[in-house]
From Swiss-Prot:
One of its GO terms (biological process) is positive regulation of gene expression. PANTHER family: GLUTAMATE CYSTEINE LIGASE, GLUTAMATE--CYSTEINE LIGASE CATALYTIC SUBUNIT. The gene is gcsA. The keyword ATP-binding applies. Monomer. Disruption phenotype: Cells show defects in prespore differentiation. Its EC number is 6.3.2.2. It comes from the Eukaryota. This is Glutamate--cysteine ligase. An essential enzyme in glutathione (L-gamma-glutamyl-L-cysteinylglycine, GSH) biosynthesis, GSH is essential for growth and differentiation to prespore stage. Catalyzes the condensation of glutamate to cysteine. It comes from Dictyostelium discoideum. GO terms for molecular function: ATP binding; glutamate-cysteine ligase activity.
């Protein structure tokens, strides 16, 4: 999870005096990175994936809070064999979470694609070596009853000093200082606990104020006009059919699937960054896998907005609710959100009109970058990141060598969690310019995760080689991200997408370049010359020098994604919703009780380990590769 260092971290009140220093030297470090790497060229197409896992107790289906113990054992393998280890393991926010990546980057496409699924499978096996007989790991996006009574093993006390949550004990937080410091400092910076609000699914027996009744035993909880979001009657948390959550763990405790790609040079990285931005909401909808939160069926299908709200550190001034006295900017988004601007490249496909959002950026940072030869688009991108405060400052890493270190830059960069991330090379490294695709939700099986990993890698190469053009206005990308959260958006809703992905239109109205399409139309085409992204990928694959085995497997992955887009194969969110609604213990009141959760998690385990095959989410067994 982002930039992690060793050492003691500063509490917010101790950090404040260093904020400007960190920002100032972060800019200096950024300029050094650009100066040293602006002409860097890397030959190989290196790439990789990140998969996040949760640990559960098989006896009671509670979250098992000992992932850090298992992680220590896994990382010991890496220390013993740093150059030959098959997998790398890193801490994630939850004490019940582990993040796994390949031990070394994948290189190119071709036969390399045959190893993706086996690598994911061996990752599971690697973790399972250290599990107790009553423990399992799962790749599910959200644990259904997170925040309900006694949902962890061991049990913890709520209202702890770090999160001050009514629902989550501090014991769910990874013991590494970064995570507790992030949690406390976000809360302190914003001036109170985070306030996460999402719509509840309204079933026929769902009470209007169900969450408030369960939480406060009042309807609504407290009626007053104070500024406290938990007591203000106008607050979203007090609205009917609302699910309220109050801690970073509700968001950062969700699991995702991410892919990162090294491009030949800075210009290609800028191109891929821009082209993946409009693709991101589509991938969120296509991978939607989270419909239960805090023990309730929600009316959304994806995690992104929950994480966005869970780390929103904006205070009243930055939210525009009070005059700017102690802060510089009114900021329109959480620091975990969609991108705010394209960064352009030498490609002729970019037009300034696509950046139609009123970008908030630090003009002093922008001017310094401009004065040092950074172009306007890239300067605005980084100056936008620097409107945020650093959240985690290590006490022994404040005064460092800006020529050799990038800690202060990464402090800012790594806590701007956006749908796509533009990643400069680290210092003194052979690593090149990279782009990270971040919105995808983790899937139940290694095949499903491999399908999306492979698809995204081939798409990135196709963007480069075919000069694909997905540009639409940034505001339309934002609308698409909102749409992606809707229940069953993958089959029910329409998204803005470019009509012709092969042409550039240097003149004329950009409104004529895009239209509303379903996910099925975007991926499987509308007939005629419009083959959709699946058709583009299939045509592109035919030009590559794949052997028969690779071609057969890749076509299985592509077929799976095509059927997910058409609705023939259900999304995990839709399947989850139907599982709950058809469960004999469900009372059509939106409540997912312990019995339902136990059966649901057991079904997830059975599918992920191959005990049960469910064609509704896995497709035809003949098309599945195990």
């Amino acid at each position: 999870m982002g930039f992690i260092a060793e050492g003691n971290t500063l509490a917010w009140e101790d950090s404040v005096k260093y904020l400007e220093y960190i920002r100032e030297h972060g800019v200096i470090q950024l300029l050094n990175i650009i100066k040293n790497n602006k002409d860097k060229v890397t030959e190989d197409f290196k790439w990789g994936d990140e998969v996040e896992y949760i640990l559960i107790n098989n006896d009671n289906y509670k979250l098992k809070l000992r992932a850090n113990e298992i992680l220590d054992l896994l990382m010991l393998e890496e220390k013993r064999n740093p150059t030959t280890v098959e997998h790398l393991w890193r801490p994630e926010y939850g004490r019940f979470m582990i993040e796994g990546t390949p031990g070394s980057p994948y290189i190119g496409l071709g036969k390399q694609l045959l190893s993706i699924q086996s690598n994911l499978k061996s990752r599971r096996e690697n973790v399972e070596k250290y599990l107790k007989p009553n423990e399992s790991i799962l790749t599910i996006t959200s644990y259904p009853r997170m925040g309900c009574k006694n949902f962890t093993d061991p049990q913890g006390e709520v209202k702890g000093p770090i999160a001050e949550s009514k629902f989550l004990p501090d014991t769910v937080i990874n013991p590494h200082f970064r995570f507790s410091t992030l949690t406390a400092n976000i809360r302190k910076r914003r001036g109170g606990t985070v306030s996460i609000n999402i719509p509840m699914y309204r079933d026929k027996n769902t009470p209007e104020y169900l969450d408030q009744i369960c939480t406060y035993e009042k309807v609504p909880p407290i009626l007053d006009d104070s500024d406290n979001s938990q007591t203000n009657i106008s607050s979203p948390s007090n609205q009917p059919f609302n699910i309220y959550m109050d801690a970073m763990g509700f968001g950062m405790g969700c699991c995702c699937l991410q892919t990162t790609f090294q491009l030949p040079n800075i210009d290609d990285a800028r191109t891929v960054y821009d082209q993946l931005a409009p693709i991101s909401p589509l991938m969120l909808s296509l991978t939607a896998a989270s419909s239960i939160f805090k023990g309730y069926l929600s009316d959304i299908d994806a995690r992104w907005t929950i994480i966005s709200q869970s780390v929103d550190d904006r205070n009243k001034e930055e939210l525009g609710k009070a005059p700017l006295n102690n802060n510089k900017f009114v900021i329109n988004k959480s620091r975990y959100d969609s991108i705010d601007s394209y960064i352009g490249s030498k490609s002729k496909s970019f037009r300034s009109e696509y950046n139609d959002l009123d970008l908030v950026y630090d003009k002093d940072v922008y001017q310094k970058l401009i004065e040092n030869g950074v172009d306007s688009l890239l300067s605005k991108h980084f100056a936008h990141l620097f409107i945020r405060d650093p959240l985690v400052i290590y006490s022994d890493k404040i005064e460092i060598d800006d020529e050799k270190n990038t800690d202060h830059f990464e402090n800012i960069q790594s806590t701007n969690w956006q749908t796509v991330r533009f990643k400069p090379p680290p210092p003194s490294s052979s690593i090149g310019w990279r782009v990270e695709l971040r919105p995808m939700e983790v899937q139940l099986t290694d095949f499903q995760n491999s399908a999306f990993v492979v698809f995204s890698a081939i798409l990135v190469k196709a963007i480069q080689d075919l000069k694909l053009n997905f540009y639409i206005p940034i505001t339309k990308v934002d609308e698409n991200l909102k749409t992606a959260h809707k229940r069953a958006s993958v089959i029910n809703d329409k998204f803005y997408f470019r009509k012709n992905i092969y042409n550039n239109t240097p003149n004329g109205s950009i409104e004529n370049e895009y239209e509303l399409m379903t996910i099925n139309e975007i991926f499987n085409g509308k007939g005629g010359d419009n083959k959709g992204l699946i058709g583009v990928i299939r045509d592109y694959i035919s030009t590559l020098d794949f052997d028969n085995e690779t071609t057969e497997l890749v076509n299985k992955y592509i077929k799976f994604i095509s059927k997910r887009a058409s609705g023939e194969i259900k999304s995990i969110s839709t399947w989850t919703r139907e599982f709950v609604q058809n469960h004999p213990a469900y009372n059509h009141d939106s409540i997912v009780n312990d019995e339902i959760q136990a059966d649901y998690l057991q079904r997830c385990l059975d599918i992920s380990n191959g005990t049960i095959y469910d064609s509704s989410i896995q497709g035809d067994k003949d098309d599945y590769y195990c």
